[in-house]
């Protein structure tokens, strides 16, 4: 599942459109993950027991997540190196199960498609999905 030159161009062009709404997309994607996959709330229990998509910390962290995806777009030619610090943080300090990266990627795709339905063509879907799966693999790199 490597990214072709066309995939990379497609991801970059779509990110240019998404970036202005990335905080909202990230907050909604994280909120959806917490509702649809309630076991993921365990990683955020320090925010309190009322974790829901409208919780200010969910929205704030969603923006941080999308900042990480933006960093990945900038490092699209070497995701492992570009995301090594984030991989180390999630593996050794936060101890996040790397399976959650794919769950979150699914929710980011879903919300991005909702925000940009005309731009989210099947070709964009394929390229963004491949990209986010590569991001998930890069984030899991330090777990090995």
From Swiss-Prot:
The keyword Heme applies. Red blood cells. One of its GO terms (molecular function) is metal ion binding. Residues 2-144 form the Globin domain. PROSITE patterns: GLOBIN. Keywords: Heme, Iron, Metal-binding, Oxygen transport, Transport. GO terms for cellular component: blood microparticle; haptoglobin-hemoglobin complex; hemoglobin complex. It comes from the Eukaryota. InterPro entries: Globin, Globin-like_sf, Globin/Proto, Hemoglobin_a-typ, Hemoglobin_oxygen_transport. It holds the Pfam family Globin. Heme b binds at residue 90. One of its GO terms (biological process) is hydrogen peroxide catabolic process. O2 binds at residue 61. PANTHER family: ALPHA GLOBIN-LIKE-RELATED, HEMOGLOBIN FAMILY MEMBER. Heterotetramer of two alpha chains and two beta chains. Involved in oxygen transport from gills to the various peripheral tissues. Belongs to the globin family. This is Hemoglobin subunit alpha-B. It comes from Seriola quinqueradiata (Five-ray yellowtail). The gene is hbab.
């Amino acid at each position: 599942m490597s990214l072709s030159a066309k995939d990379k161009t497609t991801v970059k062009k779509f990110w240019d459109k998404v970036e202005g709404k990335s905080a909202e997309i990230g907050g909604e994607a994280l909120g959806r993950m917490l509702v649809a996959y309630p076991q993921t709330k365990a990683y955020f229990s320090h925010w309190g027991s009322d974790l829901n998509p409208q919780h200010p910390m969910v929205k704030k962290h969603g923006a941080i997540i999308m900042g990480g995806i933006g960093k990945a777009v900038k490092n699209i030619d070497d995701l492992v190196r570009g995301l090594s610090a984030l991989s180390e943080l999630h593996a050794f300090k936060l101890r996040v199960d790397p399976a959650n990266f794919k769950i979150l990627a699914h929710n980011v795709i879903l919300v991005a498609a909702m925000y940009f339905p005309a731009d989210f063509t099947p070709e964009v879907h394929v390229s963004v999905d491949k990209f986010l799966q590569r991001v998930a693999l890069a984030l899991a790199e330090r777990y090995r």
